[in-house]
Amino acid sequence: MSLIRRSNVFDPFSLDLWDPFDGFPFGSGGSSSGSIFPSFPRGASSETAAFAGARIDWKETPEAHVFKADVPGLKKEEVKVEVDDGNILQISGERNKEQEEKTDQWHRVERSSGKFLRRFRLPDNAKPEQIKASMENGVLTVTVPKEEAKKPDVKSIQISG
C-alpha cells in the first residue's frame, strides 16, 4: 500500500505536469540543472492544489461541535462561514493570485485561482445562532455550541401494600 498521494490527470487543480524532457541535457528546463532554457518556478501549482483540497476536521466535544479547516495563505476576508436553511453549515473560500516576473530576456505573468466549498448538516442539538469563527496561522476554527442535554424528569412512585 502506498502512502504517496498521486495526482489525477482529470483534476483541474492537480497541476503536477509531467515533463517528457525532464532529465535530458537539452530538456525544457523544468528541473534539469544542465538545461540551456530558463527554469520557471512551479510553486503556485502546489499551493493551488493544497488550497483546492482544503482539509476540514469535525470534532464533537461535550459543549460544542468544532470544525477546523486548513486554509494556508488565505486571509479572513477570503473565507466565508454561513448557515443555510437553519442547520447547514457552509464553509467556502476563494483565492486569486497573480505572480509577475521580469528579466532582460523574458516577462512572465502566472495567474492561479482556486475555490473550495464544504457543507455540513448540523445535528439537532446545535445552536446555529451562536456560531463563532476565528482564524489563526492558516487554520479556520468554527465553534457551534450545543444545547444542554435535557435531564430526564424522574418521579418516584410509592408502592402501597
Curated annotation (Swiss-Prot):
One Pfam assignment: HSP20
Which stretches make up the sHSP domain?
47-161
Domain of life per record? Eukaryota
Cross-referenced InterPro entries: A-crystallin/Hsp20_dom, CS_dom, HSP20-like_chaperone, Small_HSP
Q: Which Gene3D superfamilies does the protein's record reference?
A: 2.60.40.790
Q: Name one GO molecular function term.
A: unfolded protein binding
Q: Which GO terms describe its biological process?
A: protein complex oligomerization; protein folding; response to heat; response to hydrogen peroxide; response to salt stress
The UniProt keyword set, sorted, is: Host-virus interaction, Nucleus, Stress response
Concerning what turns on (or off) its expression, the entry says: By heat shock.
Looking up SUPFAM superfamilies in the UniProt record yields:
HSP20-like chaperones
Q: What is its main location?
A: nucleus
Q: Which family does it belong to?
A: Belongs to the small heat shock protein (HSP20) family.
Q: What is this protein called?
A: 17.9 kDa class I heat shock protein
Q: Which organism is it from?
A: Oryza sativa subsp. japonica (Rice)
Gene name per UniProt: HSP17.9A
